[in-house]
């Protein structure tokens, strides 16, 4: 069963900013742009304005996700990905970007696409304190305990934490 689109009220804080839109049919994220030009040196971060604020219906939240092309081509990431926009928030949506490229600066021009906004229905939960949780196949395994990465699977000289062994990816990359 396909639901229709969710109606979201939007306020344009910059009269020239485009309303967030989807690049292709079926896309999950609507593109957000920056309203200010900025240049980030390697390792530098900035909070970029999008020129929009929204009012989500109760039971929904929006999540600010990175754009894969910026990550792949420029080394740009979002510091708090995904950023959460709660239904009651009415301020401007801003995006915290960081330039992870070790050598090159990255420049953003006004109205460059910098992130994607994904709107999702969210559930409210009630937490019930218990002395013990029921068992599961996974138990307390986390942080790579299911494998699937060469640096974690059978890593020699790795770090052991809670019975799990981890490779020091940072040390490996820095040649230490």
UniProtKB/Swiss-Prot annotation:
Belongs to the dUTPase family. Pathway: Pyrimidine metabolism; dUMP biosynthesis; dUMP from dCTP (dUTP route): step 2/2. It holds the Pfam family dUTPase. It comes from Streptomyces griseus subsp. griseus (strain JCM 4626 / CBS 651.72 / NBRC 13350 / KCC S-0626 / ISP 5235). The lineage of its organism: Bacteria, Bacillati, Actinomycetota, Actinomycetes, Kitasatosporales. The keyword Lipid biosynthesis does not apply. It is an enzyme of class 3 (hydrolase). GO terms for molecular function: dUTP diphosphatase activity; magnesium ion binding. Keywords: Hydrolase, Magnesium, Metal-binding, Nucleotide metabolism. This is Deoxyuridine 5'-triphosphate nucleotidohydrolase. One of its GO terms (biological process) is dUTP catabolic process. It comes from the Bacteria. Its EC number is 3.6.1.23. InterPro entries: dUTPase, dUTPase-like, dUTPase-like_sf, dUTPase_trimeric. Residues 141-176 are annotated as: Disordered. It catalyses: dUTP + H2O = dUMP + diphosphate + H(+). Substrate binds at residues 67-69, 80, 84-86, 94. This enzyme is involved in nucleotide metabolism: it produces dUMP, the immediate precursor of thymidine nucleotides and it decreases the intracellular concentration of dUTP so that uracil cannot be incorporated into DNA. Gene3D superfamilies: 2.70.40.10.
């Amino acid at each position: 069963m396909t639901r229709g689109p969710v109606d979201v009220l939007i306020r344009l804080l910059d009269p020239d900013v485009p309303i967030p839109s989807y690049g292709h049919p079926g896309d999950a994220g609507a593109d957000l742009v920056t309203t200010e030009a900025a240049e980030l040196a390697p390792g530098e971060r900035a909070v970029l304005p999008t020129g929009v604020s929204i009012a989500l219906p109760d039971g929904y939240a929006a999540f600010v996700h990175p754009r894969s092309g910026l990550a792949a081509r420029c080394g740009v990431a979002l510091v708090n990905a995904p950023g959460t926009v709660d239904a009651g928030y009415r301020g401007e949506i801003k995006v915290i970007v960081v330039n992870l490229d070790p050598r090159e600066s990255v420049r953003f021009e006004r109205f460059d696409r910098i992130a994607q906004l994904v709107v999702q229905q969210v559930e409210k939960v009630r937490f019930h304190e218990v002395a013990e949780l029921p068992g599961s196949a996974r138990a307390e395994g986390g942080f790579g305990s299911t494998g699937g990465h060469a640096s974690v699977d059978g890593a020699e000289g790795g770090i052991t934490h809670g019975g799990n062994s981890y490779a020091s990816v940072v040390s490996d990359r820095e040649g230490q």
